[in-house]
């Protein structure tokens, strides 16, 4: 049976049947964020703390801000993990999903400070599709994207993901996770 003819209603079944998807490990990083909101109120929260909906988005935006340490620390941890994976799989790649074009450039700059040269894919780049295709075929380490690598994009060598976006819809998250679950065929 061709893989395209298979349909799985549940991830557990796909894992049990084997050969289609691999398990995903989510590493939750905590951090302490402080900010002054638009009402002039001082806020100080970690990700472990429960807060109201309005502050949840504010906390996430602060965490992903280039001025703070959370984003650079997250990228550093992800880069170290990718290096470890590449000892066994030299073509393993990583994807950072960013907020917007400016954020993607900030993330790329942070990766360069770690000694990496990322491939950046932005929607206004007429070579974006070519860059994604090239990345899927080469052994570059990092792909930095804004909404360009979602449903329909197949890069089997992706092994590390950094969800550095403030888009919190379930559909977008599922599409992002979908970039990492597919098992590689022996010839990929």
Where is each model-derived feature located?
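Short, surface-exposed connector motifs at secondary-structure boundaries
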Residues: 86-93, 113-117, 156-160
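Conserved RecA-like P-loop NTPase helicase motor core
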Residues: 117-188
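Well-ordered alpha-helical segments embedded in enzymatic catalytic cores
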Residues: 70-80, 103, 130-131, 148
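Generic, well-ordered alpha-helical scaffold segments in large soluble proteins
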Residues: 81, 110, 114, 176-180
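Interdomain helical connector at the RecA1-RecA2 junction of SF1/SF2 helicase-like NTPases
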Residues: 2-91
């Amino acid at each position: 049976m061709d893989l395209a003819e298979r349909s799985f209603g549940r991830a557990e079944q796909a894992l049990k049947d084997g050969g289609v998807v691999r398990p995903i490990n989510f590493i939750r990083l905590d951090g302490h964020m402080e900010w002054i909101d638009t009402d002039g109120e001082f806020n100080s929260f970690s990700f472990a703390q429960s807060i109201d909906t309005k502050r949840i988005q504010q906390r996430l935006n602060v965490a992903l801000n280039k001025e703070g340490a959370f984003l650079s620390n997250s990228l550093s941890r992800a880069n170290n993990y990718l290096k470890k994976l590449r000892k066994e799989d030299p073509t393993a790649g990583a994807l950072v999903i960013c907020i917007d074009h400016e954020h993607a450039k900030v993330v790329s700059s942070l990766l360069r400070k770690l000694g990496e040269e990322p491939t950046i894919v932005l929607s206004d780049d007429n070579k974006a599709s070519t860059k994604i295709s090239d990345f899927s075929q080469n052994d570059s380490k990092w792909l930095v994207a804004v909404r360009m690598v979602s449903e329909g994009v197949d890069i089997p060598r992706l092994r590390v993901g950094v969800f550095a976006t403030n888009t919190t819809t379930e559909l977008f998250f599922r599409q992002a996770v979908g970039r990492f679950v597919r098992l590689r065929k022996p010839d990929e």
